[in-house]
Amino acid sequence: MNWLDEVSWDEKGLIPVIAQEASSGDVLMFAWMNREALQKTAELGQAVYYSRSRGRLWHKGEESGHLQTVHEIRLDCDNDVVLLKVTQLGHEPGIACHTGRHSCFFHLYKDGQWVVTEPVLKDPGSIYK
């Protein structure tokens, strides 16, 4: 059996993916992959996702330069979630989020409201031209 056949794809042929920084354990982002994206990620050693809004493959960093080198690809116990252990690269290393932050998970629920916990490391307007 092909390793991709062991993945439990959803009804749209997608699987949720979490990117985790290998060195710190920080959760950087959540995205989706289709079969082709997962195959390309394994082949290239760089994260390639499937953009549901664009309806196409999205090589992380193709516009921003913030590539992700993939060290491990893991599948959870139900075969329906992928975990990528990555090193976040780029002109400004450590920026994974399109908002210019280290992580996409920068909102913290505290005392009945969402609080921004991470600074913008670089203005997204200067990243995406």
UniProtKB/Swiss-Prot annotation:
UniProt keyword annotations, A-Z: Amino-acid biosynthesis, Cytoplasm, Histidine biosynthesis, Hydrolase, Magnesium, Metal-binding, Zinc
Protein location: Cytoplasm
Superkingdom: Bacteria
InterPro entries: PRA-CH, PRib_AMP_CycHydrolase_dom, PRib_AMP_CycHydrolase_sf
GO molecular function: magnesium ion binding; phosphoribosyl-AMP cyclohydrolase activity; zinc ion binding
Pfam families with a match to the protein in the record: PRA-CH
Cofactor(s) this protein cannot do without: Mg(2+); Zn(2+)
Assigned GO CC terms: cytoplasm
Keyword Zinc recorded: yes
Catalytic activity from the UniProt record: 1-(5-phospho-beta-D-ribosyl)-5'-AMP + H2O = 1-(5-phospho-beta-D-ribosyl)-5-[(5-phospho-beta-D-ribosylamino)methylideneamino]imidazole-4-carboxamide
Residues bound to Zn(2+): C77, C97, C104
Top enzyme category: hydrolase
Gene Ontology process terms (BP): L-histidine biosynthetic process
Residues where Mg(2+) binds: D76, D78, D80
Function: Catalyzes the hydrolysis of the adenine ring of phosphoribosyl-AMP.
Subunit record text: Homodimer.
Protein name according to UniProt: Phosphoribosyl-AMP cyclohydrolase
